[in-house]
């Protein structure tokens, strides 16, 4: 059976620093749906791009990589409630109908609510996307203008049909309750995000903060071969400022293309704009001086860390180029 892969899609640059709050890898899950007869709603939250497998059928019909409901034979519409992996402010939506050509919804709307205890009884749902027409086999990017914090969303499709992927881009909101807990302050699920980078030819630096170890070489940050003096770099914001106790640099799957060395610079800045950070980052002090790298290996540093009471942003320098899979900054959230 031939397998077709989704066409390459370039996310709008404005969303490159946002987190997909509906990513199953950080805990997003389907709570309830009106119907998922042809394809389970949870597939809609998968990180991987959708595929189409020719001649693949199951007991319900054609297998589709997404959420698909049966044909509606009465008035009404279908819906799906999703608990976001982390609460946050929503900036944009991507309703992706890739490979749904004769079975995509005519239109869709989306509501959101804040229910931190998970009880949706009496929840106040806000409309963040009015009923909007959809097209076949394509991404639909919708910007959202709402400053509220949300924990759940409800996707409504009219009248029925299928959605390959639903992505909800925004900024993670973390309510600090424990300043003594050690956690990865850079992790995607804790609000870490990419601000800028020198190059991302083979893999985007947003992969550095993904959950778990990299699944392959494509699930990491990899730059093109450098043919001029210098080195590659990326700037990231921690989800919360804190004191760093342990650093992990993982070169999983990078064997003939790992960097010779990696160093990390750091700074603590309150209310800094992303634009002002980029030119100043080259002058930040070192949190970790240049360390030699090995192929396909987790490098751990504790005693090598240069002391900072608070860190809010880091700059990772990959000398001179190459690829790394993950970076973890273990520490405690700083007290105000």
From Swiss-Prot:
Pathway where this protein functions: Nitrogen metabolism; (S)-allantoin degradation; (S)-ureidoglycolate from allantoate (aminidohydrolase route): step 1/1
This protein's record includes keyword Hydrolase: yes
Swiss-Prot/TrEMBL GO biological process terms: allantoin catabolic process; purine nucleobase metabolic process
Keywords of the record: Hydrolase, Purine metabolism
UniProt xrefs under SUPFAM superfamilies: Galactose-binding domain-like
Keyword Hydrolase set for record: yes
Coiled-coil stretches noted in the UniProt entry, renumbered to this chain: none
Domain of life: Bacteria
The protein's Enzyme Commission number: 3.5.3.4
Pfam families: Allantoicase (PF03561)
Reactions the enzyme catalyzes: allantoate + H2O = (S)-ureidoglycolate + urea
GO molecular function, one term: allantoicase activity
Family per record: Belongs to the allantoicase family.
Protein name per its UniProtKB record: Probable allantoicase
Organism of derivation: Acinetobacter baumannii (strain ATCC 17978 / DSM 105126 / CIP 53.77 / LMG 1025 / NCDC KC755 / 5377)
Lineage, broadest ranks: Bacteria, Pseudomonadati, Pseudomonadota, Gammaproteobacteria, Moraxellales
Gene that encodes the chain: alc
């Amino acid at each position: 059976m031939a397998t077709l892969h989704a066409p390459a899609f370039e996310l709008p640059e404005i969303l490159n620093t946002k987190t997909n709050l509906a990513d199953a890898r950080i805990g997003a899950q389907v709570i309830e749906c009106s119907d998922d007869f042809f394809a389970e709603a949870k597939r809609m939250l998968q990180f991987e791009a959708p595929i189409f497998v020719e001649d693949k059928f199951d007991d319900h019909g054609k297998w589709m990589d997404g959420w698909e409901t049966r044909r509606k034979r009465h008035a009404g519409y279908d819906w799906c409630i999703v608990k976001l992996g982390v609460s946050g402010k929503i900036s944009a939506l991507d309703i992706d109908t890739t490979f749904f050509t004769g079975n995509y919804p005519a239109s869709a709307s989306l509501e959101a609510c804040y229910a931190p205890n998970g009880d949706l009884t009496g929840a106040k749902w806000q409309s963040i996307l009015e009923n909007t027409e959809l097209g076949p086999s394509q991404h639909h990017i919708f910007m959202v203008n709402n400053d509220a914090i949300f924990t759940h969303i409800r996707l409504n499709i009219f009248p029925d049909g299928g959605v390959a992927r639903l992505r909800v881009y925004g900024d993670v909101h973390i309510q600090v309750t424990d300043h003594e807990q050690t956690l990865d302050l850079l992790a995607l699920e804790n609000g870490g995000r990419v601000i800028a980078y020198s190059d991302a030819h083979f893999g985007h630096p947003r992969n550095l903060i993904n959950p778990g170890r990299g699944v392959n070489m494509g699930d990491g940050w990899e730059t093109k071969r450098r043919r001029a003096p210098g080195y590659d770099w990326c700037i990231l914001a921690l989800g919360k400022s804190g004191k760093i106790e342990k650093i992990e640099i993982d070169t999983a799957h990078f064997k003939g293309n790992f960097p010779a060395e990696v160093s990390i610079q750091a700074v603590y800045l309150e209310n800094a704009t992303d634009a002002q950070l980029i030119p100043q980052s080259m002058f930040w002090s070192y949190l970790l001086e240049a360390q030699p790298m090995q192929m396909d290996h987790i490098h751990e540093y504790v005693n090598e860390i240069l002391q900072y009471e608070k860190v809010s942003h880091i700059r990772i320098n990959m000398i001179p180029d190459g690829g790394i899979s993950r970076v973890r900054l273990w520490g405690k959230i700083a007290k105000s």
